[in-house]
Structure formats: C-alpha cells, structure tokens
Amino acid sequence: MSLSDLKPVIERAFENRDQINAQTKGEVRDAVNEALNALDSGKARVAEKFQGSWEVHQWLKMAVLLSFRLNDMSTIAGGPGENTNWWDKVPSKFEGWGEAEFRKAGFRAVPGAIVRRSAYIAPNVVLMPSFVNLGAHVDEGTMVDTWVTVGSCAQIGKNCHLSGGVGIGGVLEPLQANPVIIEDNCFIGARSEVVEGVIVGEGAVLSMGVFISASTKIIDRATGEVHIGKVPPYSVVVPGSLPGKANPDGSPAPSLYCCVIVKTVDAQTRAKTAINELLRD
C-alpha cells in the first residue's frame, strides 16, 4: 500500500484501538508494519516542514502507538553478558544487521548505542552510547553524544550537536500532541532538556543546563519579547529567572525559572559550537 492508502486504515484502527491486540491479523497489522518500516527507512517521518511551517502526521504517531497493542513481549538479543537478552515489544533497529547493512546505512553506532526499530538514522550521524526511541528521525551529520536520549517521534535536524546527557522529550508518555523538533544546525548544551513539543529554530544554541517545556518563558534580553513553545532561529539561550512578586508582608517571593536569549549567533559562537568533520569521515 502507498502511504496515502495506509493513513485511513490506521486512523480507523486507532479509533477502535480497544479491539486491537496481539492476535489481530490482516489489513491493520500490515498497515502498521508498513508505516513503521517507512519511518525506519526515512521514507516517512512524523513531522515535516512544509512552506515554512511544521506539519505533524498524526496518523504515523498513531501507528507507533498501535504497535504496542499489536506486538507481544519477546526476547531481544543484546542483553548484558554473554548469550543474554532484553524483554520488550519493540525490537532493535539493528536486529539481523551485519557489516553490509551498517555500511549501506552510513552512520556510526558505537558500543552502547541503542536504537529501536522505526527510528531513522541518516548517513554521517554519530551515535555515542545513547538511546533513540521509536519513530524518531535523526538527520544527516548530527552528533548524538554520550547518554543522550532522543524521545519517541522526536525530529532532529541536519548537522546538530546533542551534547552529553541531553534529553529530547517524546510523545508517548505523557501523551503529547506534537513531537519535539530540533531544526538544522542547532547546538544543544550538555544536560539540557527540551520537551512537550517545543521547536528549537534553525541554528539556535542552548547553553549547558537549559530546560524548556511548552510553558517555559523564553525572554529576549534585548527587547523583552517573550516566546513560548519555540526558540527563535539563531538565538543563544541560557538559563535565567524571573523575579517573584512580593509577598503580602513585603518580603520577596521565590523567583521563577525562565530561559533568556542573550544574543544572536555570531562568528564567535559558531567557532565554539562548530561540528568536527573529522568525526564524520
């Protein structure tokens, strides 16, 4: 079936998801498997940019969710120790892969990198020991550094750097309407977290320890403009705080966390955050 043919089948199945289980056969199972294969190969993605705006294909997210009802628990090779397994419903992307498959895929996956089936990893990506969840899309030339987690259906652009310990939120639990999107050429500093469908605009730089959710205020220090849910392109963002209102007795109330845009990316910023082409040969 074509992608356009899969969509109505999956949408109908999702409406009747209480009737879907591991014994379900036929059209629904075939449609979900085809959708997951399309995500896994990069032929489809949960979100795409169209005429300057991001469009979310909710039916592909539905396919990911339905797969949990369709698939029973089973052993997955690669557990700790010799001849041991994991126990889950989602197989590894690398199940059955050998040298030929890795060479064709064109990315690096060092020991300790875990990718679940239906996540797409583009050529010239580097996966350090990290976790990429199902339905995610990691585009060309991106570095996924040590202990990074890329959540379900998250969209990571080209030539990004996700520094050590970064967390990119998923859509499955708690259930989110839209995935987190990191656009091309972004730098996400160590231990930062971006969740709840936030969009980080192209070329933006988040310093170490920046936490952004759908309700976090992102304040431009120069203009006072407040952004919520999206980091403007080419912004340099650091953690900050907003002063609390005074208590009834006049004492200061606790301040509230926010993010602060301190400047626009310049040559000095680019020099500090540039990707290393030597690591992608």
Swiss-Prot record:
GO terms for molecular function: 2,3,4,5-tetrahydropyridine-2,6-dicarboxylate N-succinyltransferase activity. It catalyses: (S)-2,3,4,5-tetrahydrodipicolinate + succinyl-CoA + H2O = (S)-2-succinylamino-6-oxoheptanedioate + CoA. Keywords: Acyltransferase, Amino-acid biosynthesis, Cytoplasm, Diaminopimelate biosynthesis, Lysine biosynthesis, Repeat, Transferase. Pathway: Amino-acid biosynthesis; L-lysine biosynthesis via DAP pathway; LL-2,6-diaminopimelate from (S)-tetrahydrodipicolinate (succinylase route): step 1/3. GO terms for cellular component: cytoplasm. It holds the Pfam family Hexapep_2. Its EC number is 2.3.1.117. Belongs to the transferase hexapeptide repeat family. This is 2,3,4,5-tetrahydropyridine-2,6-dicarboxylate N-succinyltransferase. The lineage of its organism: Bacteria, Pseudomonadati, Pseudomonadota, Alphaproteobacteria, Hyphomicrobiales. The gene is dapD.
